[in-house]
Swiss-Prot record:
Protein name: Neurotrophin-3
Residues in the signal sequence: 1-3
Keyword Glycoprotein: yes
InterPro entries in alphabetical order: Cystine-knot_cytokine (IPR029034), Nerve_growth_factor-like (IPR020408), Nerve_growth_factor-rel (IPR002072), NTF3_N (IPR045815)
Family note: Belongs to the NGF-beta family.
Keywords assigned: Cleavage on pair of basic residues, Glycoprotein, Growth factor, Secreted, Signal
Gene3D superfamilies hit by this protein: Cystine-knot cytokines
Compartments it resides in: Secreted
Biological function: Seems to promote the survival of visceral and proprioceptive sensory neurons.
GO molecular function, one term: nerve growth factor receptor binding
Gene of this entry: NTF3
Amino acid sequence: IQSTSMDQGSLTEDSMNSFIRTLIQAGIWKNKVPKQTARTKDGMQTTVKRTKAEAEAVASEGTRLGFQPVVLVDAELLRQQRRFSSPRVLLSENTPLEPPPLYLMEEPAVLNRTSRRKRYAEGKSHRGEYSVCDSESRWVTDKSSAVDIRGHQVTVLGEIRMGPS
């Protein structure tokens, strides 16, 4: 699989998850070959472990050649996944003609990551603050009645008793 940088649409989480699931099933996720499966009498799939001899043969072959086995990707798998367009990765059957451009080095805004502008809200927010008393610029301590936010006359309690009476 070759990857190149592209600026195409964005991926939804569901489409990316199904694509990763397809890669895992195809055995190309993290260069792993899928485990062999067998069906039991009741139709359930079970994983068949490799014998010790098979595991040693695969391990010695990899060390003898000096590299991990390469998993071939079927072109049909790539054709099925064309709908997964990512702004960063493109699955392609062809080798890229040139290295990907370095977008981050060209953008001057990214070079100075410490300079950030603060967002300021316009005006002072008074959400959740309601006045029970008449509007005055000083504390009112001698009032026995007031007008609430709905315009009703209410009695101001001078003392609030809490606990058992």
